[in-house]
């Protein structure tokens, strides 16, 4: 399905519940909210699934679109959700349309708008809104700027390309307050987050002459820093600050004792292939998985696979 066909499909239906993924980031939430706004502008009933895991800094931008308790949807739309295992709660068989940019999308929805060449879902939603409405409101521009900028690390990640920057420029022209949003999402941090980063950096490990960097975040570290879920956004970017690092591994201990692994890499290494060994996936240069063991063991396991794949 292309953008034009998706827009026509959305015009023919109604009563949409728009669904984000587990541990939602700026791309899934910004894209969901912008699409919701556009659908309402063309006379459709649309609401967001009120994902309980949304971090505090995102809430002011998205909670106005949350579905009320009595909302009964006729159709589910998943945005930036590569597989049905990534839903915040059970939506199996309830999603008719998926809009995504992950090349590993499992094609679980009846209809799929997939653009794996895009750095973010926000870029796809920008095209879709222009097809639906002809223009983009200032509020939608802010939401989509959040989406695009957070999925590209404020345009520092390798997934950023000329098309990404052109999309950001269009959003700026539509009124996105880029400078304000950059401060909120990339510069300002809580005291707990800064304490946690200090612990993370002091415990960073390096392998293969610094080409592989690994950081681990344990439950004990979170407790000592006084950090909450709101302080954990984009922890995966920390390992990549090492100057020689080509493969960056972030391992976070989850409440059940398992480890969430985020992997970012240069073009020489396929992150998605490595994470697929553990049932995960994502993009070539940014992927993730969950390993059912403590962080120390997860580090050994993921390093073994990296060294096997990257000779």
Predicted regions and their residues:
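Hydrophobic residues at beta-strand termini and immediately following loops
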Residues: 49, 99, 113-114, 215
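Short, motif-level signal for alpha-helix interfacial/capping segments enriched in acidic residues
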Residues: 1-5, 78-79, 129-131
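Short alpha-helices
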Residues: 102-167
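Glycine-rich, phosphate-binding/catalytic loops in enzymes
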Residues: 35-36, 93-96, 114-115, 166
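Active-site cofactor/cluster-binding pocket
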Residues: 59-111
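Short, hinge-like loop/turn segments at secondary-structure boundaries
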Residues: 64-67, 114-116, 266-267
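Glycine-rich oxoanion-binding loops at beta->alpha junctions
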Residues: 54-63, 119
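Hydrophobic helix-and-loop "lid/oligomerization" segment in the mid-to-C-terminal part
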Residues: 2-24, 28-57, 68-75, 150-277, ...
């Amino acid at each position: 399905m292309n953008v034009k066909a998706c827009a026509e499909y959305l015009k023919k239906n109604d009563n949409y519940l728009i669904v984000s993924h587990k541990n939602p980031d700026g791309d899934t939430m910004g894209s969901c909210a912008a699409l919701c706004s556009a659908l309402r502008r063309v006379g459709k009933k649309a609401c967001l699934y009120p994902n309980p895991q949304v971090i505090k800094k995102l809430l002011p931008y998205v909670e106005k679109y949350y579905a009320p308790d009595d909302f009964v949807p006729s159709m589910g739309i998943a945005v930036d959700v590569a597989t049905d295992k990534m839903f915040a709660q059970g939506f199996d068989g309830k999603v008719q349309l998926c809009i995504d940019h992950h090349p590993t999308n499992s094609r679980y929805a009846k209809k799929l708008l997939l653009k794996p060449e895009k750095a973010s879902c926000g870029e796809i939603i920008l095209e879709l809104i222009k097809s639906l409405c002809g223009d983009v409101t200032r509020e939608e521009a802010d939401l989509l700027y959040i989406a695009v900028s957070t999925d590209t690390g404020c345009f520092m990640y390798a997934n950023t390309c000329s098309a990404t920057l052109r999309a950001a420029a269009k959003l700026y022209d539509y009124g996105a307050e880029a400078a304000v949003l950059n401060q909120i999402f990339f510069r300002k941090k809580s005291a707990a987050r800064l304490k946690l980063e200090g612990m993370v950096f002091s415990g960073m490990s390096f392998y293969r002459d610094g080409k592989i960097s690994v950081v681990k975040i344990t439950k004990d570290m979170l407790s000592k820093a006084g950090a909450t879920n709101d302080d954990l956004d984009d922890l995966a970017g920390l390992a990549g600050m090492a100057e020689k690092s080509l493969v960056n591994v972030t391992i976070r201990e989850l409440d059940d004792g398992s480890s969430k692994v985020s992997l970012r890499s240069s073009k020489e290494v396929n992150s998605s292939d490595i994470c697929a060994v553990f049932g995960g996936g994502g993009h070539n240069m940014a992927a993730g998985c969950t390993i059912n063991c403590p962080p120390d063991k997860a580090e050994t396991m993921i390093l073994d696979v990296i060294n096997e794949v990257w000779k």
